């Protein structure tokens, strides 16, 4: 027979026992919590990079022959790289996948809200 490991602590006359299952649930909750912070950190990083790259510094250009600065197109290149290498391990891929995940989460929340509204409407019609 396999023994389940338990930890215990005493308080007065009562002994409290916590099982491994409760500890595993706490670990899962911690993982979800920290994963949310990582996603938010990546989202802010992407937003900051976008803000930096969208403004170009063409003030040094003296005539039309100098043309636009090259860093204007660098943001597009990163986005294309993210789309082309979806299964790769690049940083832009992580940003891309988080944007898609965030969009899907938003859609899921919207669908749940719509479902709840329709359920409430059907309940109110049944009561009348």
UniProtKB/Swiss-Prot annotation:
Location comes to: Cytoplasm; Nucleus
Which tissues does the record link to its expression? Expressed in seedlings, roots, flowers and siliques.
Q: Where is the motif (SOFL-B)?
A: 59-68
Q: Give the motif span (SOFL-A).
A: 11-16
| Basic and acidic residues bias locations | 80-104
Nuclear localization signal: where is this motif?
111-118
Recorded GO cellular component terms are:
cytoplasm; nucleus
Keyword Cytoplasm in the entry? The reply is yes
Q: Where is this region: Disordered?
A: 1-26, 54-128
Residue spans with biased composition (Polar residues)? Answer: 8-18
- Which keywords fit this entry according to its UniProt record? Cytokinin biosynthesis, Cytokinin signaling pathway, Cytoplasm, Nucleus
GO annotation terms (biological process): cytokinin biosynthetic process; cytokinin metabolic process; cytokinin-activated signaling pathway
Spell out the InterPro entries in the cross-references.
SOFL (IPR044670)
Top-level division of the source organism's lineage: Eukaryota
Q: What is known of its domains?
A: Domains SOFL-A and SOFL-B are required for function in cytokinin-mediated development.
Q: What is the recorded function of this protein according to its Swiss-Prot or TrEMBL entry?
A: Involved in cytokinin-mediated development.
Family, per entry: Belongs to the SOFL plant protein family.
How is this protein named in the record?
Answer: Protein SOB FIVE-LIKE 3
């Amino acid at each position: 027979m396999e023994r389940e490991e338990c930890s215990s602590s005493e308080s007065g006359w009562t002994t409290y026992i916590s099982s491994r299952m409760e500890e595993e649930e706490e670990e899962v909750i911690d993982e979800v919590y920290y994963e949310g912070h990582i996603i938010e950190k990546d989202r802010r990083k992407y937003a900051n990079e976008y803000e930096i790259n969208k403004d170009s510094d063409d003030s040094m250009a003296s005539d039309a022959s100098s043309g636009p600065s090259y860093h204007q197109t660098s943001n597009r290149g990163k986005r294309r790289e993210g789309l082309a290498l979806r299964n790769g391990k690049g940083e832009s891929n992580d940003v891309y996948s988080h944007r898609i995940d965030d969009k899907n989460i938003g859609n899921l929340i919207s669908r749940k809200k719509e479902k709840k509204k329709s359920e409430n409407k059907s309940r109110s019609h049944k009561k009348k």
